[in-house]
Amino acid sequence: YLSYAFPHNHELQLNYTRRINRPRGRQLSAFRNVSDSTNISYGNPNLNPEFANSLELNYIKSWEKHVLSTSIYYKYTTDVIQRVQFQSLENPRVMESTFDNVAKSQALGVELVAKNRLWTWLNLTTTVNLFYQQMGEIVYRDVLLKEASDGFSWTTRLMANFIFGKSFTGQITGSYGSPRVIAQGKTNHFYSLDLGLRKSFLNKTLNLSLTVRDVLNSHSWHTTTWGDTFYQDFERYMYGPHFSLNLTYNFGNMKPKKKPQSNREVNDNMMDEGGEYFE
């Protein structure tokens, strides 16, 4: 990580990271889901973790109430974990799906982040990410399932933070993602809206928070996959909105720390969650 600060609130950063993405429980489970006799799914206990190498150049300009960050990045991932689908050898009318380390992928993109403190009671964070992604050829059990593919995608995220008082805050978050290349096809666009309220008591020792996810009941996963002998549309609904009420108490000077995620990590996680669905 290298950083250089110029006069008049200009800053240039160069950052290299290597991230390990380990397979999740459902992706590893060998249990066969046969609730749909024509679509059988199961995990792969022999999955290896993904290794993602990222190189990023950031330019940051700050004003009194505004910050603008522009990033150019390159990401190279090996042993990409994705779902693979194929016709059953026992019955060609039955589709089987599992997970495998299918390929290598590359992404080159630009990310813009704007933070604006408009009033004392409102600040906005806007993120736009545009990238070109290339996925290598998909091979499963020495069989070529799909040739290499590529495509342009973009995502955006708007987060509004409201300050109603010293101990009362609120948040609205909206996200959108365009269609995206996956192992054997593409995902369709997605969008979502989340709300949150937080109230603190006893000098911020006691915190009460209410979260409403997927307010518009729009959070679904729609993928289209194809091969030499099949074409399939798959759509999963979350059946929202989802409500959660949390009460936390902090002892002493303990302050929980949460590593902030970039817009790219947020959307990658969303895609992973949708991709490991079995029902």
List PLM regions with ranges.
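Structural signature of Gram-negative outer-membrane beta-barrels, strongest in the C-terminal barrel
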Residues: 1-77, 161, 166-169, 173
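Residues on the lipid-exposed face of transmembrane beta-strands in outer-membrane beta-barrel proteins
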Residues: 2-4, 47, 57-61, 72, ...
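Outer-envelope beta-barrel architecture signal
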Residues: 8-10, 64-68, 120-126, 154, ...
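Transmembrane beta-barrel strands of outer-membrane/channel proteins
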Residues: 14-18, 53, 70-76, 126-132, ...
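Outer-membrane beta-barrel translocator domains and adjoining extracellular loop/strand segments
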Residues: 25-33, 37-41, 72, 80-89, ...
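Outer membrane beta-barrel strand-and-loop segments of large Gram-negative receptors
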Residues: 42-44, 48, 54, 63, ...
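Conserved C-terminal beta-signal and adjacent last beta-strands/turns
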Residues: 149-279
